[in-house]
């Protein structure tokens, strides 16, 4: 009986989310939604123009951050704090 109770306690602890973690979209080879590392509770979207801006549009970078990045000249940055609040501008909203 003690073994059964101990097993149930262990399974319950493993299934619980013991700390809230933010999920953000991240760019890489493809756009994915990932859980942010501890301490990075904000999502961001940074856009800027490169040499192909006229034909391809602005470059978009998505990810997690602890603090909203400092804006450099010719960049636009938005930060938010809810799950997947930083979708790529070309993604369809659900």
UniProtKB/Swiss-Prot annotation:
Listed GO MF terms: acetylcholine receptor inhibitor activity; ion channel regulator activity; toxin activity
Xref: PROSITE patterns: SNAKE_TOXIN
UniProt tissue specificity: Expressed by the venom gland.
Signal peptide positions (record): 1-21
Record-annotated disulphide pairs: 24-43, 36-64, 49-53, 68-79, 80-85
Keyword Acyltransferase attached: no
Alphabetical keyword list: Acetylcholine receptor inhibiting toxin, Disulfide bond, Ion channel impairing toxin, Neurotoxin, Postsynaptic neurotoxin, Secreted, Signal, Toxin
InterPro entries associated with the record: Snake_3FTx, Snake_toxin-like_sf, Snake_toxin_con_site, Toxin_cobra-type
GO CC term, one of those recorded: extracellular region
SUPFAM superfamilies xref list: Snake toxin-like
Keyword presence, Transcription regulation: no
Localization per Swiss-Prot or TrEMBL: Secreted
Main localization (coarse): secreted
Chain's role: Binds with high affinity to muscular (alpha-1/CHRNA1) and neuronal (alpha-7/CHRNA7) nicotinic acetylcholine receptor (nAChR) and inhibits acetylcholine from binding to the receptor, thereby impairing neuromuscular and neuronal transmission.
UniProt similarity note: Belongs to the three-finger toxin family. Long-chain subfamily. Type II alpha-neurotoxin sub-subfamily.
Protein name in the entry: Long neurotoxin LNTX8
